[in-house]
Amino acid sequence: MIKKYLFLFFIFLIFNFVLSIQPPLSEYNCLKNFVTKFKLSTKFPTNSTGGYDFCSIVSCNPVNGSINGFLSLQSESTTPTTVTVVGTDLSCLPFNNLNLQNFLISTTLLYTKFFTSCSTLAINSDSITSITQVLAPYETFTIVSKKLNGALKMSNFINQKSILITNSNSTSGYTLVNDALAENKIKLETPNFSGLLSVPDLTGYTSLGYPAFYFSDALEVTSLALANIKTIGAVSSRLYFPSTKTIQFPTSYHNDTSYLTIQGKFTKPTAVIDLSKFVNCRNIQILNYDKTFNINGEIPIKTSPFTDIYYTDGNITKIPIGGTSFVTWSTEQSITIKKSGLSGTLPPLSGVIPTYYDFSGNSISGTLSNTWCNTNIIVTDNLMTGTLPSCIVCHLNNSEVAKKFTGNKFTNLVTSNPPCTTFAPKIKVDKSQKTIILTGTDFGTYTSGWILNTTLSCEKLWTKVTYGSNYTCTYPSTTTLDKVSYFWINFNTPGRNYTFPAISQVPTPNSIIVGTSNSVTISGTFFSTYIGYVTQSISVGSISCTVGTSSFSSITCTLDSAPSTNTEQKLIITTNSLIKEAYISTVVGFNNNKLCPNDCTSSTRGICYMNNGTCKCNSGYVGLDCSGLQCKVPNCSNGGTCNTTVGLCVCDSSHQSLDCSLDFKQCPKGLNSLICSGGGNSCNNQTGICTCNSSHQGLNCSINYKQCPIGSNSLICSGGGNSCNNQTGICKCDSSHQGSDCANDFIQCPLKNSIPCSGHGICNNKTGDCTCDSGFTNQDCSGYTCTSNNCNGHGVCDTSKGICQCYPEWQDIDCQTPFKNCLDPTCSNNGICKNTTGICECNSSHQGLTCSIDFNQCPIGSNSLICSGGSGNICNNQTGICTCDSSHQGPDCGTDFIKCPTQNLTPCNGFGNCNNITGSCSCDQNHQSEDCNIVYKECPIINSLICNGFDNSCNNQTGVCTCDDLHQGLDCGLEYKPCINNCNGNGVCNNQTSICTCYEAYQGETCQFQINQCPNNCTTGGDCDTITGICNCYPLRINNDCSGYECLDPNCGDHGICNDMNGLCICDKGYRGDNCIYVDHYASSVIPTKEEGGTVLIYGLFGEINNDPNVQVGNSNCLISNITSNSIECIIGKGSGIKDISVTQNGFEWIGKSMFNYIKSKQSCPNNCNSNGICNDLQGKCECYPGFTGHDCNSLSKTDLISPSTPKVNENTANGIIENGENKFEIMVITLQEKTFTNGVLKQYNLENNWKLLEIINDENNNIFKFKQNLTDSSEISINLEIIKKDRIINFADYSFEISKDSIKVSINISNYIYSNSLNYLQLHLKSNAYKTNKTSSDDEFDCNLDDGSDAKIDNQDLENSNINHENFVTIIKDNKILNGRYIDHVISDGISTFISSRTIEKDSNSITVGLNLPHCKNCLIDPDFSVLLSTDFKENCSDSNSNNYIIPVSITVSIGGAAVLVGSAIFFYRKKFIENTLKIQLKRLSKNNSSGSDGGNTQS
């Protein structure tokens, strides 16, 4: 309770703090003058003191009260006024967004940019009747007027990225003229034109994003120019035609259009509208004003399979599932049909169909079957009943799911803890594809609610494979899933968390407890994901344990009976095919949680005793973790040792065999030093004797051996005179034998021409006989054989030729065929005589023994018989004609002959033709009946149907239609539709259309409602529901009269507010983009690379969204290798010099002018050291010869001539003072300016004489004075002045510098400065004064170093050229003494060294002011310093007088801290350095003080 009151009290304090804020005085007076001028007393009442509490009414900065955000002002005058808003009325306010309502507007306000910090201007004023000039360069410009008419030139909108022009008078309008030059058409992105009279031609506008076009009621359909729609090349095109005009639905669009919205009253199409060629269109929205845009109750368009369809307020009677009569939809489409009269029951799904349907606001009835589970179905506000399927019920605790089904009468639509017993996701990990696959039952489609643990993460959202049943998640390649055993997924709906295995692993228990009542509790991993997909069984000993609950990490089960407690019992857990065994103690309450080493390696090697953590190894395995293999003979027969790694004996040198039980003796080695000469020879290590292979012989098998063949008499080479060579293995036979084994006798065959068997046969030397080749004969194979050796006994074979000579009665090559002659050997020249039979073979057109008679085939009937067979049908095959009997007809006699009805002996009564095939009459057009004796009259035909079809009937004797109850007319072609309730007496019924024509004051289908007008007639932004008097706004239109425009993201990314005048987001400071999702990026520091090229580091603010990032250095691209929210790393090629740097992302460019400076490999020295030193080109610094000093060695180093200096700090002014002799030098921080990118001064803070001393520190080492002053309520500037007590080295921005004793070091801190605009930058001014004190020296009149009255010599080239050795010098030579002002060209920006610039601002006869251009950073440190040295022209002796030299060292460090808030802008120009032309500075000589004074003293002026 106390916390509650404290919280309320805190809110009270905040509320009062907000109410107490007031704008700065100048802004307060500015707004007060406007309120007074226009008498805005209602919105801005005075308070009790007579003043105004502006910040309680308008948007003020919560810190300093500045009106630098959104300002909306509305006239309160109800009568015409002549008081006009002019630019100077409000140019004194720093708002960035201005909205003016109902004022009389000066035209100069339209064409001149008075409000420099403003990027968005909206004006609603009927005083604007035309736009005749180029509008002022506000990026977003809105003009609303009821009197804006005529032709508006697009060339007047070239300065706008977003333009909204509205004529809110529905009886008039305007047109657009495309007259802008091509280069001026690029900037416009979001045009919004309302009140158009025709479709504009936007040819050449290539940057369009989301244009919208609202057409006036006054348009003429004939001049609408619908063809111009194809010139609108935009991401999304929106066209809203008035409800008062009927137009043709446009059919031609630009190919680049991805999203199309079109609203209107469209004529009823007569054919399907084919838009399928516009394949780039991803979504088309059709918003109807009436019910005519359909074909037979279906959507009348055909789209590509990638186009989503949104159709509303039409008349669609058929519930489309897989498509329409004109097109089949694909799974890639989404279908939305709202408030269009869909009715009937929702059918179950089948086939390939879209996965998204929105049927909201229709009249669909029936139940929702589970076939819809794999779709995203929305049926809000229908008439459905019954129960929702489980796939939906499981996720009703998600309001996004539940609202899809509200407005029906589902009995189980429970949103709080809905019952869910079927939820069962299933996971598979595919490591090869680095993919997690999710399948299962009723796990839903709300993928953003599926959260993986930190072990894994999806690179993107879950990817749909099959909607509602199969999804995949690709995890990053950096994730080593091999090292991950399992992971969990939290399913937001229905609110369950499950752990899934990443690998296949046996159950792994780590704790097992047997409890009372025979209960068993097991903890560990890899048991089960959940019920449904894993079969488990558990037993302890021989007792089964019935599973009660099971999860990935635990199991509870109940034993069927009490287990034995005498000894450990074996626990067996079986999960599918994976088995885990362990021995446990079954003593009640004992925790078996002792894990064995390496889990006993595997279940096949050993089992863990979890009561004591020891392994029981299975047979064949040994070791603490059973990882070793036991040898078959454990002691290896005392002839060796067992190697348990491989389970084999390692024998000693005198034993062998697997168990080392056999002795070992070495066999002799061959000439090749191999035992038994190697090869296939073997050694008997028990006897030491070689056994040679079949190819070797000898004691060591070194001699080759080849066995000769053995003959049939079992003798080598068959014995006898034959011999064997067992080196080669070849027999040598004697002259009477042959063969490889010399076993065969040798006998010569008959010879011809000394050739055995005449060369035509094979000689058998065993018998001496020839075997002749085919075709040869005789003993020596010299003769030829006939085909038949004896010519079949009907002839004689001539072996010299191999040909049969046949006897006269026979023929053929082998004389086997008798020879017979025909009766007419010529066969009448109509055939061929066959001598084998003596019969003529006639051709197809003749017949007879001699082929002299013609032959013609008669037709064959369908029964495959000639003349169809039958006894009465006869074929004449000389003529080929059938003669049919009396009951048949036709060429093949295959058709029956039937007589027709006859009247007066005349078939068909003479009024028709007889078909003797069917026996029926075909009456002429004027007769009917079987015999054509009845007259026929035709009834009227419509729609190609007699009497229009349906249940209408025709009397063909009279030709008159009889209509059913639903039709009327001579041809029944008119529908008969009675009106409901006869129009309630408030109108006239048309019973052809069943439509009531209501009297003037009534409306509705049955004239049942009175007409109620809507506010402002819905301002052309919506349709008036005249029943309720409430506007139904068009998409993206809002407010009760639809006068407002809804932003694409109404929440503006939670970083802005939506301006309903133009539908554009007004982003908070620090954000930008159409939806305010991008940060206003900038760079605060750059670490460059050498001229050879390399890695560049850029630090700043870049946000989490980095779309299409690009870095340019000068004209070179810097290839990005890494980008984070606050840094960019990129690689660039070689270059040189100072370059602009630009960072582009999310479509916006930021530019840092002269922010990048290539690092030189060799540095040049200033003035080449004036020949008084050597240039160190690595550092760009002079190493002066003895006697010289200074940055360019142009000064003398004699310090014995120098009078000591006296440093001081003025505690009232915070000025640093150094006095030396009669000269006094002051160092002051005088001004801080906020400047625009065009160098204009927006704000200036005069710092002089406003410092407050905070603290003085004075000890042995330090003497520091601390000051500060407030810049605004939220920002301040502080300064520390330190008097240096001893020489020391200062390290700054990676460089080292020496600062001398008696110097003054100045540190400046600017914190929490809030910029008016991100285009702006800060410039800090430091001023140095040189004076003569009132004291003079008697030596002065003799000092030859005093000037002669001429001007001082000034050299500021280094300051204007920052590309030399990181040091910029301003050199002032006076009295032969040199004042060196050193400005380092680097700054420590948020802890990082980066390049900056400094420049001369102003000079006069005794002072110089230097400006430091500060980077955009939270903390910046800048370190200039000053010193006075001797010129080389300095004279040590002037006659009789001594000269004096003055050295004034000053060091200044500046820091900027805190948060600087940026205002959104299209392009950032960050002012890092301003390089001016060489400034010729001439300081007038210091006036010589001739007044007398005490010698040697210094006084403070």
Swiss-Prot record:
Sorted alphabetically, the Gene Ontology cellular component annotations on this record are: membrane
Q: Which residues lie on this side of the membrane: Extracellular?
A: 21-1446
* Principal location class: membrane
Domain of life of the native organism: Eukaryota
| Stored SMART domains | EGF
Phenotype upon gene inactivation: Cells are unable to sporulate when in pure population although they will sporulate when in chimerae with wild-type cells. Cells form loose aggregate before disaggregating. Cells aggregate and disaggregate in waves. comC-/lagC-/tgrD1-mutant fails to form spores.
Q: Does the keyword Oxidoreductase apply?
A: no
Q: Membrane spanning segments where?
A: 1447-1467
- EGF-like domain boundaries: 627-661, 782-816, 818-852, 896-933, 975-1008, 1043-1077, 1161-1194
Protein name as catalogued: EGF-like domain-containing protein comC
